[in-house]
C-alpha cells in the first residue's frame, strides 16, 4: 500500500526552482502564502480552508523556497527579494498575469512586498497576522524563529500560536516536530533568522511610503490575542493602506484560519467575490 503524503501536491519549475504547490478549483486565481513556523508547509498552513475557498475559485498554495518540499538551492540567500522573485516565478510558471494574494504572518510580508514591486500582478490583498511593518520582536516570534528541534520546544512554539491551548495536543506537537526534522528542513530554517532576530523583523518590513502607495483593496485580519505578531501591526497597516478594512477576532491567537475558521472563510470569500 502506497503511503501518500498530503503535503506534496505537484512540482513546477518556478524561476529555476523545483516548487511544490497545491492547485485546486477553477476560476479567478488566488495564491495563499504560508507563514514561517518550523516545519511549515503550504498544506499544513492552509488545509482547513482550501476546500471551501476552492469551491468558488482556483486556489494555489506553494511551498516557498526554503520551506516544505520545494527545492533548497545551494548557496541561496534567503530574504525578501529572493522570496518575492520566487513568487513571481510561480505566477510565470502557471502563466498567471494577475492574482489575489492571501498572506499569513511572514507570508503577509511577502504578499505586501510583492504588491509593492508588481502592483499590476495583484488584484486584491488579504493580510492575516501579517508582518510588513516593523515592531519590537515578541517573545513568541523569537521562540518561533529560534526553534531548535525537540517535542517540548515544538509544543512551546504552538502554545504561542494558539489562544485555545487545548488545540495543542501531544499528538499534534509530535507530528509537527517530526515535520520539522525532515531532511533539510531545519538546516534551511535555522539559516533564515539567526539571532539577533530584531533585524529580520525590520528586513521583512516595507517602508511606510511604499505601503501608503498601495492602491489594492485590502482585507486585514488579526487575532486580538496574538502573542507572535502584535495586533498593533495590523492597526498600523490599516492606517497606512487607504483602501483597507480591518477585522479583529476576539478569543483568537496567531491561528486565525484555524481558531476562527468559519469567520476567516466567510470574510475572505466575500471579499474576493467582490468586483473592483
Curated annotation (Swiss-Prot):
Protein name per UniProt: 2-hydroxy-6-oxo-2,4-heptadienoate hydrolase
PANTHER family: AB HYDROLASE SUPERFAMILY PROTEIN YCLE, MONOACYLGLYCEROL LIPASE
UniProt keyword Hydrolase, yes or no: yes
Metabolic or biological pathway: Xenobiotic degradation; toluene degradation
GO molecular-function term, one example from the UniProt record: 2-hydroxy-6-oxohepta-2,4-dienoate hydrolase activity
Cellular component annotations (GO), alphabetically ordered: membrane
InterPro entries linked: AB_hydrolase_1, AB_hydrolase_fold, AB_hydrolase_sf, Epox_hydrolase-like
Family listed: Belongs to the DmpD/TodF/XylF esterase family.
Domain (AB hydrolase-1): residue spans on this chain: 28-259
Species the sequence originates in: Pseudomonas putida (strain ATCC 700007 / DSM 6899 / JCM 31910 / BCRC 17059 / LMG 24140 / F1)
Enzyme Commission numbers on file: 3.7.1.25
Amino acid at each position: 500500500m502506497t503511503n501518500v503524503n498530503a503535503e506534496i501536491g505537484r512540482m513546477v519549475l518556478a524561476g529555476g526552482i523545483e516548487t511544490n504547490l497545491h492547485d485546486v478549483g477553477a476560476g479567478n486565481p488566488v495564491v495563499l502564502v504560508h507563514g514561517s513556523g518550523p516545519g511549515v508547509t503550504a498544506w499544513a498552513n492552509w488545509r482547513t480552508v482550501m476546500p471551501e475557498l476552492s469551491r468558488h475559485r482556483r486556489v494555489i498554495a506553494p511551498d516557498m523556497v526554503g520551506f516544505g518540499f520545494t527545492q533548497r538551492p545551494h548557496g541561496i540567500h534567503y530574504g525578501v527579494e529572493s522570496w518575492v522573485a520566487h513568487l513571481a516565478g510561480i505566477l510565470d510558471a502557471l502563466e498567471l498575469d494577475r492574482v489575489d494574494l492571501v498572506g499569513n504572518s511572514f507570508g503577509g510580508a511577502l504578499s505586501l512586498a510583492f504588491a509593492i514591486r508588481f502592483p499590476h500582478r495583484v488584484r486584491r490583498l488579504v493580510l492575516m497576522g501579517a508582518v510588513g511593518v516593523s515592531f519590537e520582536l515578541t517573545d513568541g516570534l523569537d521562540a518561533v524563529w529560534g526553534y531548535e528541534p525537540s517535542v517540548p520546544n515544538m509544543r512551546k512554539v504552538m502554545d504561542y500560536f494558539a489562544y485555545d491551548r487545548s488545540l495543542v495536543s501531544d499528538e499534534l506537537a509530535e507530528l509537527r516536530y517530526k515535520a520539522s526534522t525532515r531532511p533539510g528542513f531545519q538546516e534551511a530554517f535555522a539559516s533564515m533568522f539567526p539571532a539577533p532576530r530584531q533585524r529580520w523583523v525590520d528586513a521583512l518590513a516595507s517602508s511606510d511610503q511604499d505601503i501608503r502607495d498601495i492602491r489594492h483593496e485590502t482585507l486585514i485580519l488579526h487575532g486580538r490575542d496574538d502573542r507572535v505578531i502584535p495586533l498593533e501591526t495590523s492597526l498600523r497597516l490599516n492606517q497606512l493602506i487607504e483602501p483597507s478594512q480591518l477585522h479583529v477576532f476576539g478569543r483568537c491567537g496567531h491561528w486565525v484560519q484555524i481558531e476562527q475558521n468559519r469567520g476567516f472563510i466567510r470574510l475572505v470569500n466575500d471579499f474576493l467575490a467582490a468586483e473592483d
